Amino acid sequence: MSRGLGDVYKRQYINDGGFILKEREKFGSRLGFILVSAGCAVGLGNVWKFPYICGENGGAAFVLIYLVFLAILGFPIMCAEFTVGRGSGKGAARAFEELETKGSKWHHFKWVSIVGSYILMAFYTMVAGWMLYYAWREASGSLAGLEPDEVSGAFGTMLSQPGTMTIWMIVAVLLSFGVCVLGLQKGVEKITKVMMALLLILIVVLAVHSLVLPNASEGVKFYMVPNLDAIKSRGLGPVIFDAMTHAFFTLSVGIGAMEIFGSYLKKDRTIGGEAVNIILLDTFVALMAGFIIIPACFAYGVAPGAGPSLLFITLPNIFNHMAGGRIWGTAFFVFMSFAALSTVIAVFENIIAFYIDLKGFSRKKVVAGNVIFMILLSLPAVLGFNKLATFQPIGPGSSIMDLEDFLVSYNLLPLGSMIFVLFCTKKNGWGWEGFRKEANEGKGPKLPEWLRFYMSYILPAIIVVVYLKGYYDTFKLKGTGYLVGWMIFACVLLLAIFGIANYKKKDA
């Protein structure tokens, strides 16, 4: 199979077994590619996790450690995923077989991409619905004047009402597929550019407002001033691992969502330079989210936390005590809605492109088939907080959403990242020479030759550590038998990945 033609054409299979060639749509602008890719990377973890773990782990000292891991972990994986996309000119459905060595089995990994995308969206669409629902509640004033217990109760009431959550989940699904059905340039690129521009404006305005609140300076100190005592109290090891894992998970690499945008990318710029821009934008959003949340918490004497309770209980209480709180609360949840929907749109585009590349279906046909399927697929996560609350799949207190998050965050993202890295460095995959040549095409910083050893041996080892530590942290408190069983399962998955990656027919 010829290599490199995929960046110009895609195969669209028709009923008689033949195919026609059609020019593949590209991004209309460099800015469009950067903002759409950053929209995929910018997720809820940037807001409900990063500011808290940053403050708890030593402030600016943690940020420096985090930036190091973004450079040595997130950057090369993102480069690998983008380059596979641009080099093949296809999504994950055809990318591996377009570039792999004859007789290898890399093309089987396409299923990791599509399965990961579906499982991620099975709960992410629900959470995007939460953001839209709270934006509406803040705008309508229905949260204004509530006491703290009532605000907490409002979130609990929402979780107990499958009808409410289903309606808003459906709104998120329809909005996102509505963007995707318009196409790459007229839909995904055009609308995501507007959303990301508004997101960046909102986040700056909200951050400035928080910084001028009374006593906000104490929050800034907690968040940004290096605190070596905090690092000593936690231990350097846990701090480093928190930085490493967040750097790994923040960029949404591993399930092909970045790969598909690489397939729409022109060759006038190097992959490394574009990856740096996206990482910087993602980091900017994460840091600015902290300047919104932490100073506001200190200004009103509220302990900053993490997770959904921070967004849906702590912050609404703060807005209720703030002058113009209804306006600021609405602006915040509109910002969060944009952050969530930009990710949903990006992953939906990956799903759509999978079927277009694999079967030659039209975009409209793929969207029509997936709208109903995605709504049905998202229902278990919705019901897991009410009708199916007694089903606790990964231990006491867990929910169906926790299971889906575990499958994606602790399995498909790290294993998918491993696949892309190995594919770009192993001879029976694409190979280092082909990968580096494609990545360095165009203007911008080039990937150096010395990176080969690091990406071939050290980076896979780091990914294995992140992967196994994720399993350990998830199951360490659930009993030795539980932990050992799941750790064995994790190792079996790793062996399967390496087995397929190293397979090659002797006569090939």
At which residue positions do the language-model features occur?
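Single conserved hydrophobic/aromatic residue that forms the stacking wall/gate
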Residues: 1-12
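Membrane-interface "cap" regions at the ends of multi-pass membrane proteins
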Residues: 15-48, 77-82, 86-111, 266-270, ...
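Membrane-embedded translocation segments of transport machinery
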Residues: 22-27, 189, 193-341, 345, ...
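Inter-helical loop and helix-membrane interface segments of multi-pass membrane transporters/permeases
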Residues: 24, 53-57, 87, 92-112, ...
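Select transmembrane alpha-helical segments in multipass membrane proteins
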Residues: 26-37, 62-65, 105-118, 166-172, ...
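Transmembrane helix-boundary motif of multi-pass solute transporters/channels
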Residues: 31-69, 218, 256-262, 273-276, ...
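Membrane-water interface regions at transmembrane-helix termini and the short interhelical loops
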Residues: 53-57, 105-121, 156-160, 171-195, ...
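C-terminal membrane-solvent junction of multi-pass transporters and transport-like membrane proteins
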Residues: 108-116, 361-371, 407-467, 479-484, ...
